[in-house]
Design a protein with these regions (language model features):
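Helix-loop "lid/cap" segments that line or gate small-molecule binding pockets
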Residues: 86-93, 103-111, 185-190
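Hydrophobic/aromatic-rich alpha-helical bundle segments in the mid-to-C-terminal region
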Residues: 97-104, 118, 122, 129, ...
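Hydrophobic alpha-helical connector segments
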Residues: 52, 67-95, 153-157, 179
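Amphipathic alpha-helical interface segments
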Residues: 10, 14, 87, 91, ...
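Amphipathic, non-transmembrane alpha-helical scaffold segments
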Residues: 8, 50, 54, 58, ...
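Helix-turn-helix
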Residues: 6, 14-48, 52
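Short coil/turn segments at alpha/beta junctions that flank glycine-rich nucleotide-binding fingerprints
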Residues: 17-21, 95, 142-143
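Generic hydrophobic, amphipathic alpha-helix propensity
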Residues: 3-12, 28, 53-57, 61-64, ...
Length: 193
């Protein structure tokens, strides 16, 4: 692993645990063994480093979802919705730092004043909602999902799923303990009757 990759990996953990505001470059330097000058050689400032991480988070999450949905054969759109929910919960459980980073409030405060930060966050969430929307559209085409606004329904499905992940991220409730109920509730909401 290159020094730059090592810095990115450690900084991802640090920003996930402490947030953008409270993470310090001195602490990152200590964690990686890289001098602060080396960190600033690779990344102009703390904000640039954070934006690099957000871009990596976006690409990682969306690419993993794209790979997953490309290799899966879904019987129906309703089955795809259930699988996407399950995979989202799986990803959040296996990559907790990525999701904790997205759930930290200070990223959104930065997005208010930094258009690149806002773009990365919007692209990440739009990419995820688009996956849910594809599943809803597929279900409406095959008849497994009733007639409703695909985009609005995708937003609701994503919000339900991500809300459960947030509980898990903040150690309030184990997302896995409710995954079956979440999927069953979404099925009841969507099924074409």
């Amino acid at each position: 692993m290159s020094k730059k990759e090592s810095i990115l990996q450690a900084a991802t953990w640090l920003f996930a645990k402490k947030g953008f505001k409270d993470a310090s470059m001195a602490e990152l330097s200590k964690m990686t063994g890289a001098a602060e000058g080396t960190i600033f050689y690779h990344f102009k400032n703390k904000e640039t480093l954070f934006l690099s991480i957000l871009e990596t988070v976006k690409l990682t999450i969306i690419n993993e979802f794209d790979e997953y949905t490309a290799k899966k054969q879904f019987k129906t759109g309703l089955d795809m919705v259930e699988e996407v929910i399950s995979f989202y919960l799986y990803m959040a459980g296996h990559n907790p730092n990525l999701f904790m980073l997205l759930h930290r409030h200070d990223a959104y405060e930065l997005a208010e004043v930094n258009p690149v930060c806002r773009e990365y966050l919007e692209d990440t969430y739009n990419g995820l909602v688009n996956i849910f929307e594809r599943a809803v559209n597929l279900g409406q085409e095959d008849g497994s999902i009733g007639a409703m606004s695909a985009r609005k329904t995708a937003l609701i499905l994503f919000t339900l799923t991500d809300g459960l992940v947030r509980f898990n991220s903040y150690n309030l409730y184990n997302a896995g303990a409710l995954s079956g109920e979440l999927i069953a509730s979404c099925r009841r909401m969507l099924i074409n009757v």
